[in-house]
Amino acid sequence: MKEEFKISLAQIRCDAANKTENLRRIEKTVIKAKKEFADMVIFPELSLTGYVVRDQIYELAETVPGPSTTILESIAKRTKLHIIFGMPELSGKTQATIYNTAVLVGPKGFIGKYRKMYLPTHSVFEEKRYFRPGYEAAVFDTELGKIGLIICYDIFFPEVSRLTRLKGAQLIVCISASPAVRRTFFETLTTARALENTAFLAFV
């Protein structure tokens, strides 16, 4: 792992169902992070589309790689930064199957993706209605080190972070769209997951 690098945690506002505007905001934020000497920029869960889009998800979902990831790859290549963002992924194999996916791109293009394993179905959350759960941890070799990806509710379940660490992750990145009222839970959980796995952890 690189001895030292700078991460920009980009807690941007995402417009529901407006990919064009969200991509514009992502690009603007990446350019700003570049000026501030960041090496990696991390955006929230489903930052491409916004979190609450309900049935529009079927029109908004894309394959990965696909049109939007190609745009983000171009931005990453131009700025020479690593970018992590969330989006609804349309399966290239099974019709109408959609995943809640984290995507990692870098200076050389597309690096990899992770599909959220644990889908909440309580309170305002109805992810199981729209998404299929993923089933494997994801860790990727980068110029910065071995980066593992998890998404929001996954962090409540120790086995997800543990599997990610056992696959070699030196930095675990958790992207989230959780409301601020749950901040205390996530502050406790992020500390616990980092300590029990002796790994760095970044949370957006």
What are these regions (language model features)?
Residues 3, 77-84, 96-99, 151:
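Short, basic and Ser/Thr-rich N-terminal targeting/leader segments
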Residues 64-84, 155-204:
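CN hydrolase (nitrilase-like) catalytic-core segments centered on the catalytic cysteine
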Residues 11-31:
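N-terminal phosphate-binding loop and adjacent alpha-helix
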Residues 93-167, 180-188, 192, 197:
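Active-site catalytic loop in hydrolytic enzyme cores
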Residues 11-13, 44, 115:
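Residue-level recognition of beta-strand->loop/alpha-helix junctions
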Residues 7, 22, 33-60, 76, ...:
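Active-site beta-strand/loop signature of hydrolases that rely on acidic residues for catalysis
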Residues 85-91:
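Short beta-strand-to-loop element that shapes/binds the nucleotide-sugar donor at the catalytic cleft/hinge
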Residues 2-9:
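Extreme N-terminal starter segment of soluble prokaryotic enzymes
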